[in-house]
Amino acid sequence: RNAEMQREIMINEITNVTGEVFMGMGVGCAQCHDHKFDPILQKDYFALQAFLSSVYWPDDRYHATEEEISKYEKDSRTWDETTEGIRDEMKSLLEAGARKTYEFRVKTFPPEVQVMFRKPWEEKSAYERQISFLVERQAEREVRTLATAEKILKKGSAELQRYGELKEEMAFFENLKPEDLPKAFVSTDTGREGAVVRMKEEEVSPGFLELLGGEVPEIEVREGTSGRRSALAEWLVRGDHPTTARVMVNRIWQHHFGKGIAASPNDFGMLGEEPSHPELLDWLAGEFVKGGWKMKRMHRLIMTSAAYRQTARFEPSNVHEVIDPENKWLWRFSPKRLSAEQIRDAMLAVSGELRHRDGGAAQTSAVPVRSIYVKKMR
């Protein structure tokens, strides 16, 4: 029931992942104290977190075209109008019990969280909106699980019998209900106001890491958003940013060779491994930026290189095997394991069952399309 702690864990995780994925820095070590090995200050951690603290995840956005959404909404309205009488009667039979269950669940949260939740939306701060979002999702999920007819209505009652009749009638219309559009997993801000981040009770403003310049960000507040995440994103993809491009091309290299030029892709600091070919890493990063940060271009550049097209044949008598048995200097191509998705696609291809397609909606793994089109729940 600790919605505040849940929110804290989520924001900390986002901050840590942002540092590792885009900057190659284990910033999480600076959450409780200054980093013991890298020059990352604790105040830098919370300044980075201040960019991300207002995020929340709406669940009402569709991953579909305007035409698909328009047709879906039209068909849904027709279905709603047709079944309105049945649904209203079913709802009225359960309403008192459902409302009681909902209120009971809300009351299990700490008193200060209940106060935040019951405030009018326009009076809530960004932090209070995030907490309310978490409380509402938990309470609604438990109502769906607990507030069933069998648990609310008295056994053998006329109300339970009537509900069963309505349920049978509704089953016919369920088959006619428009198929739900796929939901888009998106994040947005709670509003124009940024959520307050504190370090030892002191409010911390968004700021870039001292290690990487420590300049004061220019944040443009726009309608419905604090503008903080946009400011962070624009800083990360600046051409002169010292880490982002290097970290990204290192990940692409790792995808193709099984091991990055820097073998610790999430940590370019003192605890990570030094790049085996630092000049190559710098050059690839420069090409990545010059090419407009286009990943397809970088994939093509690496896959057409002499290093990638080398043989993987193992010859024990080769002098290179004696000098560099780990192939650190890339004198041959190191075999690497295929991913589960690559194995799946290969099996479908050799069996002749693979369906070739370009684009379209995501599918379940049971549909024989390439794995790039298969939903992956995280």
Positions of predicted regions on the chain:
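Sequence context surrounding c-type heme c attachment/ligation sites in exported
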Residues: 1-81
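Short His/Asp/Glu-rich catalytic/ion-coordination signatures at enzyme active sites or charged loops
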Residues: 1-5, 54-82, 105-159
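Short amphipathic alpha-helical segments and their helix-coil junctions
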Residues: 4, 29-32, 112-116, 229-236
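Primarily short, surface-exposed interaction patches in extracytoplasmic proteins
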Residues: 8-11, 39, 78-90, 125-378
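Extracellular structured ligand-interaction cores
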Residues: 15, 45, 113, 344, ...
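Long, charged alpha-helical "stalk" segments
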Residues: 82-105
